[in-house]
């Protein structure tokens, strides 16, 4: 017990971005007092498993359902992912967000809410796995989760072992009720716990970009949030949440910090939740694909309409997101409400989005020199939404872009 209290003391007295050496010293003091916890230091002995060579794809319960979740709902989402074409398109994780927890038992083990999840988490994970999918859970680095359920602070290794027994493949780890804990130290402890659990698990760092995760998160987690939560709107701010284009603007300079197995995460998709138009949802997923963002659907998969399914399963757009080169797009041009975003792809190809934030249709053209390509280069240009292909294009490519819309193309040099 002394080890636990010393570790908690460290989390309370060390300010954010403070020296991790001091944190390590305090935690080691606690471990010396209790040899059973001697492995609970900040040092990551095991390398980060290569579980996300491309951005993770899946579904998460929070955007649509919040705390209104239960076992039957999650099973229904798994059924829909497997049957709707989502699984075939590359989506694989079913992630239960906050409010699945109820309490801890007398031994400190985390207990699922028995009314919402009467069959238990292990049986639910087994069901998801039976569909050829992977299973994810949520926890928090604080004493409580954002929804007021038990957090993992002081129980990191115990919880990680429990997750492994249940068959968890993915952990979203939030940042509520953390007081003055140092984010790097807190997430490193959970990363170490997961790596020592005996099961590979993706670690999704969710501290909202408040603690400069681009400086420390790459060796620790597989993806890290860059902003507060998204909400289902074209633009705006609501409490700690941001509209889609507001979050996009926060990604402009982050391309330097994204790479395979270490992804910037601008938060989940809102496609199909009703707060934006079909055109805006096409822009949403197109821009997230350009950002090499995790594609985590946040709608009700069991009731989605044909347009939502079409948008979420566009194989050409998904292929850009999942390109193995893993380079996040840069905004290479902006004039008023008009923008061009571009990213190189493996094999010398390029993906480009012509983006119109304005209230009226507008002409936008990308020049080859903006892509560091010679003007004389011939290329085939495929529109990833209309599926039309322009052959042997030289120098530039453009079109009229709808209000709040995109033209997204893949440019393939003709050899």
Language-model features: where?
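Bacterial N-terminal signal peptides that target proteins for export
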Residues: 5-25
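Structural recognition of the beta-strand scaffold that forms the well-ordered cores
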Residues: 55-61, 90-97, 134-139, 169-174, ...
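Aromatic-lined carbohydrate-binding/catalytic grooves of carbohydrate-active enzymes
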Residues: 77, 81-180
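Carbohydrate-binding surface patches
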Residues: 288-291, 296-298, 334-373, 404
């Amino acid at each position: 017990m002394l080890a636990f209290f010393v570790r908690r003391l460290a989390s309370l007295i060390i300010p954010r971005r403070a020296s991790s050496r001091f944190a390590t010293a305090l935690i080691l003091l606690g471990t010396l007092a209790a040899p059973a916890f001697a492995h609970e230091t900040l040092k990551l002995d095991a390398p980060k498993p290569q579980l996300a060579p491309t951005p993770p794809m899946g579904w998460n319960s929070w955007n649509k359902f919040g705390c209104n979740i239960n076992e039957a709902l999650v099973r229904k989402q798994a059924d829909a992912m497997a049957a709707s074409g989502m699984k075939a398109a590359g989506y694989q994780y079913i992630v239960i967000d906050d409010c699945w927890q109820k309490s801890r038992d007398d031994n400190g083990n985390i207990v699922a809410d028995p009314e919402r999840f009467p069959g238990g988490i292990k049986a639910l994970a087994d069901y998801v796995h039976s569909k050829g999918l992977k299973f994810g859970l949520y926890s928090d680095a604080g004493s409580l989760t954002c929804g007021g359920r038990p957090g993992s602070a002081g129980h990191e290794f115990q919880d990680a072992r429990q997750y492994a027994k249940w068959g968890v493949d993915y952990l979203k780890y939030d940042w509520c009720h953390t007081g003055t804990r140092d984010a790097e130290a807190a997430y490193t402890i959970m990363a170490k716990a997961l790596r020592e659990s005996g099961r590979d698990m993706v670690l999704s760092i969710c501290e909202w970009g408040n603690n400069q995760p681009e400086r420390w998160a790459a060796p620790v987690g597989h993806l890290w949030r860059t902003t507060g939560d998204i909400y289902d709107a074209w633009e705006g701010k609501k409490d700690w949440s941001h509209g889609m284009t507001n979050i996009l603007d926060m990604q402009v300079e982050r391309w330097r910090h994204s790479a395979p197995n270490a992804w910037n995460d601008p938060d989940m998709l809102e496609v199909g939740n009703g707060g934006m138009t079909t055109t805006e949802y096409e822009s949403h997923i197109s821009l997230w694909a350009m950002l090499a963002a995790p594609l985590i659907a946040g709608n009700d998969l069991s009731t989605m309409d044909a347009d939502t399914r079409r948008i979420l399963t566009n194989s050409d757009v998904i292929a850009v997101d999942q390109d193995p080169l893993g380079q996040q797009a840069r905004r290479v041009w902006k004039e008023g409400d008009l923008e061009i975003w571009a990213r190189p792809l493996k094999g010398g190809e390029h993906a480009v989005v012509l983006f119109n934030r304005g209230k009226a249709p507008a002409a936008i053209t990308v020049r080859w020199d903006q892509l560091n390509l010679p003007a004389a280069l011939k290329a085939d240009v495929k529109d990833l939404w209309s599926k039309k292909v322009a052959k042997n294009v030289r120098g530039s490519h453009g079109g009229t872009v709808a209000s709040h819309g995109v033209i997204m193309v893949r440019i393939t040099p003709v050899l």
